[in-house]
Amino acid sequence: MRPGRTLSVLILSVSTVSCAATTYDTSITAKPAPTTTVLPTGTAAVLLPQLVTEASTLSSLIVGQGDKLAVVERIEALWAAVSAEVTGKDRDLATEIGAEVVKGRTAAVLDRPASADKVYRDLTALVKAYLASA
């Protein structure tokens, strides 16, 4: 064997032997802080216009890299607070509003400002129809 080859084999052997399995200490992981959501209180006549106002800001937050998920969570909280009341009065409108709330989250997660604009337009029309019939 040539000296260069012997040295290469020796270095390869030493580096291979020095490899060890990697272990991860999972006891160090931090637990996420618990989150609590307090549902807004009020009637549908009060909270639904707030829902539309929140939806109006979603598109600009998606474009401007703002806290779009916070807006979505407020929209969802407002809807959760009044969905039973709206469903009791008009099940079809409640289904449509609920679907638009879901579409709002999808628009935010997928960064689609045009979809957020459509959600805002649809929610505006649906809330206007609900308030006119209430």
Name each model-derived stretch.
Residues M1-V17:
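Sec-dependent bacterial lipoprotein signal peptides
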Residues C19-T23:
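Bacterial signal peptide processing site
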Residues E76-E100:
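Short, solvent-exposed, charged loop/turn and helix-capping segments
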Residues L69-R74, A94-A99, D117-D122:
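Short, charged, amphipathic alpha-helical segments
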Residues A44-L48, A94-I97, R105, D111:
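Selective transmembrane helix interface/packing segments
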Residues E54-L61, A108-A134:
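C-terminal amphipathic alpha-helix
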Residues Y24-L69:
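Immediate post-signal-peptide N-terminus of mature secreted/exported proteins
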